[in-house]
Amino acid sequence: MAMDIYLIRHGETDWNKTKRLQGVTDIPLNACGIELAEKTAEGLKDVPFDRIYTSPLIRAKKTAEIIRGDRPVELVVTDGLKEISFGEYEGLCHEPEHYTIPKLGFRKFFEDPEHFETPPGGESLAHL
């Protein structure tokens, strides 16, 4: 039996907007993020879901709740869907013009993710 799986990223947060690493820091959706989730929900309104999986982070849960709407669909919260932890670098800017991350080896996260320098207290891809 065939199964369709939809992978949907959470809506925008203030940290997304300002190019700050958020990882596992629990930042909520901003107004734009809520609007994006509502537009996604509208686009998926006729798609039947058996269940919806989400990380426990508030931005992901809120996005999932908006997409679910009033459908009687189970919302399964699982730690396995959390984002990678950036450790001490969470909250720092990764925008090239305003880069505030102390180790240049971390830049590989965006260019060559398998070889980036793991931040202090953070996770590598191998940890996941």
Tell me what each language-model feature is.
Residues 12-71, 77, 126:
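Active-site-proximal alpha-helix that buttresses catalytic centers in soluble enzyme cores
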Residues 1-6:
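Extreme N-terminal starter segment of soluble prokaryotic enzymes
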